[in-house]
Amino acid sequence: LPNYHTRCKMKKGILAVSFGTSHIDTMEKTIDVLEKEFAKTFEEAVVYRAFTSNMIIKKLKRTANIKVQTVGEALEKMAADGIEEVIVQPTHVINGIENDRMLQEVMEHMHLFRKVYVGKPLLSSVEDYKKAIHAVMEKTVIGEDEMLVLMGHGTDHHANSAYPTLEYTFHSLGYQQVLVGTVESFPDLRNVMAKLEISGRKKVVLM
């Protein structure tokens, strides 16, 4: 998040933007945790939630009667609540389609507020990659005969380059027992399987 501890007396709000999930248990372990951390760190701000996936928003309403707002709806609610200064923080991993969609909605609603700040996705700079990698490896134990495989969704957006870049950075930092794959793009599962075969390792830790 950008520096948000200011002396300004304007009413502040943080909009946490996620792709979303229809699995309540997963939401409690991920999105809920992040939003609570935002609220704890920035006590002077009110935290709001928005999802970018309309499919997930509709499914949550249909199956669990849970109403989650779109980015535009949440911004309109914040304005109605008297919020004047907004920080929009995505929980997205890459600067892909969902992040572009979020930015478009923010642009369309900026006139509702005196100040609007927009944070970046997880992997936005070289240092971001390094910090993310070290954070993962600090919590992960890999045996000599094992390979850690990280799987992402993948996209036809040019931001998909983040996935092979992530694998390259793992290796450049000395973590040779790590591969990165995607479900719907490159590197695909066949690429990952080929590298696993070359490595000779028979056990995989999937993350």
Predicted regions mapped to residue ranges:
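Active-site-proximal alpha-helix that buttresses catalytic centers in soluble enzyme cores
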Residues: 4-207
